[in-house]
A protein has these predicted regions:
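Conserved, short, structured surface segments that act as functional micro-motifs
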Residues: 161, 172, 178-181, 186, ...
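Cationic-aromatic interfacial patches
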Residues: 187-312, 317
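Short, well-structured beta-strand-loop connectors
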Residues: 403-412, 445-460
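Primarily a LysM-type cell-wall glycan-binding module
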Residues: 28-52, 76, 80-107, 129, ...
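Surface-exposed, glycine-biased beta-strand/turn segments
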Residues: 309, 314-421
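Short histidine-centered loop motifs in beta-beta connectors
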Residues: 62-63, 117-118, 170-171, 415, ...
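Zn2+-dependent peptidoglycan hydrolase active-site motif and core
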Residues: 74, 406-444, 469, 474
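Bacterial N-terminal signal peptides
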Residues: 11-22
C-alpha cells in the first residue's frame, strides 16, 4: 500500500513539473499585475518613459532579452504598480471628465488612477490630455451629474433604483452621501438616464486653444436646459510692465516672469441652425504659455437645480515672430494715453448682439489684399522697451485716399478720432464679432448705419501712431483681438 501511494505521489509530482515547464513565463505572469498593450511605433524606451520605469525592468518583468522584439497587440507587465491589477487603456480627457468620474466609469478607484498617471492632484488633468485607466470589465453604465439639492431618494425615484444601488455602485457611504457637481455612474440595465455630461446637455465640444486664435464652443442641449459659461486666461500684463520700465533700464528681451492678469470672458451662446448652441471666443495673444485656460460651465434644469463644471484646457503657443524695434513719440506709448483709449475700444466691442450678420469668409478691406506691411501677433519694442507690445491686426498697403471696404455685413457702432488709432471705424457683425479700421484719412459712414460686405466705408490715411499711410484692420471675437487670417480663409462659421 505504501509503495502504491509513493508511486502515485511521484507520478503526480512529475506531471505537475511537466505542466509547469510547458507553461510560458507570459502565461504564469498573467495571473496578476498591471499590463500595457503595445501600440504601433512603441518601444521599450517610450513605454518605460510613460510609466516612469526603465527598459531593463520591463525586460526583467517579462522575461525578455535585449534582442527580443515587441509587437503591436502584445501584453507587457509594467513593473512598479504593486497591489494593482488590470489592463491599461489609454483615454483622451474630454469635457466633463474628472479622476473620480473616470474611476467610477471603469469601476476602479481614484488612488489607482492618480498612481498610474503620476498625478499630483485632480486639478492636474487637462482636457485633451492622454491618460490611462485600469480596465477590469466592460460593464455598461450611464453617466448622471448630481445637481445642487438632489437627495439620494430623489435620485432613486428618478432612475427607478433602490436608494442604495447608486451608493454601492459609486463607492459612497450611503444614499445621503451625494455632493453637488459630482458625477455618478449607474448600471445601464437599471436606469432610464440619458448619460448627460451636464443636466440636459448631452454633448460638448471646444476646439483647440491657440494664442491669438478663435475658439469654437458647441453644446447639444435640451430645449428646457439653460447653459452658461466662461473662459479665463492667464494674460501677461503689458500695462504693468510699461509702468515698471519707467524706473528700470530697458532690455531687448522679455522678462522671465512678467505680471499676469486672470482675464475672464463669458461665453456668448447662441442657437446654431442645426439646433446646437455655439459660441466664438478669442484667445488673448499674450496668454501665458505653457499654461492652461479655465473653462467654467453651469447648467440649470427646468426645476431650478444647477450643476457646475470647471476644467483646465491647454493653450498652444503660436509663433508670430518679432518686429524690428521702433521709435515713436513718447505719448503714443504712455499708459495715460493708451489705457483710456483701449478701455474705450474694448468697452465698445464687449456686447454680443443676437443677430449673426456675416456669412462665410470675411472679405479683404482693400483692393490689394496681398500687399501687407505687417501681420498679426508680432512682438514689438517701442523706444528701447522690452518686447512687451504686440501687433493686434494686419496692416494693408495703400496711399492716402485709397478706398477701404467693409469685411462683412454689419452695423457701424463707432466712428471717431483716437490718439493711437487715428480716425477709426468699428463695425458690429453680431455674436461678439467686430472689425476695426484705423488711421483713415476720411471716415465715410456714420454711427448706426447698416453696411454690406465690400461697401466703401472710408479712405486710407496716416492718422494716429503710424510711420506712413496704411490701413490697420483689427478683428475682435468675444472682446479679444484675434488673427483675422483664418477668418479671411473662411475657417469659422
Amino acid at each position: 500500500m505504501k509503495i502504491t501511494l509513493t508511486r502515485t505521489f511521484i507520478a503526480l509530482a512529475v506531471c505537475l513539473a511537466f505542466i509547469g515547464a510547458c507553461l510560458s513565463p507570459h502565461a504564469v505572469q498573467a495571473l496578476t499585475g498591471v499590463y500595457y498593450i503595445v501600440q504601433e511605433n512603441d518601444s521599450l524606451s517610450s513605454i518605460s518613459q510613460t510609466f516612469h520605469t526603465s527598459p531593463a525592468r520591463i525586460e526583467l518583468a517579462n522575461y525578455l532579452t535585449d534582442n527580443d522584439p515587441i509587437f503591436p497587440g502584445e501584453k507587457l507587465l509594467v513593473p512598479g504598480f504593486n497591489g494593482l491589477s488590470g489592463t491599461l487603456t489609454q483615454i483622451k480627457i474630454g469635457l466633463g471628465d474628472t479622476p473620480l468620474s473616470l474611476m467610477r466609469h471603469n469601476h476602479g478607484d481614484a488612488s489607482a488612477f492618480t498612481r498610474i498617471n503620476f498625478l499630483t492632484s485632480p486639478d492636474a488633468i487637462v482636457v485633451g490630455q492622454n491618460l490611462y485607466t485600469l480596465t477590469k470589465d466592460d460593464a455598461a453604465n450611464t453617466r448622471l451629474p448630481v445637481t445642487d439639492g438632489m437627495t439620494g431618494l430623489e435620485l432613486a425615484a428618478e432612475q427607478g433604483l433602490n436608494p442604495w444601488t447608486a451608493a454601492e455602485y459609486n463607492s459612497l457611504s450611503g444614499p445621503w452621501d451625494l455632493i453637488a457637481n459630482d458625477i455618478l455612474y449607474l448600471p445601464a440595465s437599471g436606469t432610464a438616464g440619458s448619460g448627460d455630461i451636464l443636466p440636459g446637455v448631452s454633448a460638448l465640444n471646444l476646439t483647440a486653444l491657440g494664442q491669438g486664435k478663435t475658439a469654437v464652443f458647441t453644446a447639444t442641449a435640451a430645449a428646457d436646459a439653460q447653459l452658461s459659461g466662461s473662459l479665463t486666461f492667464n494674460v501677461e500684463d503689458v500695462d504693468q510692465e510699461q509702468e515698471d520700465q519707467a524706473t528700470t533700464p530697458p532690455t531687448p528681451v522679455n522678462p522671465a516672469n512678467p505680471p499676469v492678469l486672470h482675464d475672464r470672458y463669458p461665453l456668448n451662446l447662441f442657437a446654431n441652425p442645426d439646433g446646437t448652441l455655439g459660441a466664438l471666443q478669442g484667445v488673448p495673444r499674450m496668454t501665458r504659455v505653457p499654461g492652461t485656460a479655465s473653462l467654467l460651465l453651469t447648467a440649470r434644469t427646468a426645476d431650478g437645480h444647477s450643476y457646475s463644471l470647471q476644467q483646465n484646457i491647454q493653450v498652444k503657443s503660436e509663433d508670430y515672430g518679432y518686429d524690428s524695434p521702433m521709435q515713436v513719440a513718447d505719448n503714443f506709448v504712455d499708459p495715460k494715453v493708451t489705457v483710456p483709449e483701449d478701455d474705450l475700444v474694448f468697452k465698445t466691442v464687449a456686447p454680443a448682439s443676437p443677430d449673426k450678420l456675416w456669412n462665410g469668409a470675411i472679405q479683404p478691406p482693400t483692393a490689394t489684399p496681398d500687399c501687407q506691411t505687417d501681420t498679426y501677433g508680432k512682438l514689438r519694442s517701442f523706444n528701447g522697451s522690452n518686447f512687451i507690445y504686440w501687433h493686434s491686426g494686419i496692416d494693408y498697403c495703400g496711399a492716402v485716399g485709397d478706398k477701404i471696404t467693409a469685411v462683412a455685413d454689419g452695423t457701424v457702432i463707432y466712428t471717431g478720432q483716437l490718439d493711437v488709432r487715428g480716425n477709426a471705424t468699428i463695425i458690429d457683425h453680431g455674436h461678439g464679432v467686430y472689425s476695426g479700421y484705423y488711421h483713415q484719412s476720411k471716415i465715410e459712414v456714420s454711427m448706426g448705419e447698416q453696411v454690406k460686405a465690400g461697401q466703401e466705408i472710408g479712405l486710407i490715411g496716416d492718422t494716429g501712431r503710424v510711420t506712413g499711410p496704411h490701413l490697420h484692420l483689427d478683428l475682435f471675437v468675444g472682446d479679444v483681438q484675434v488673427d483675422s487670417t483664418d477668418w479671411l480663409n473662411g475657417l469659422y462659421p
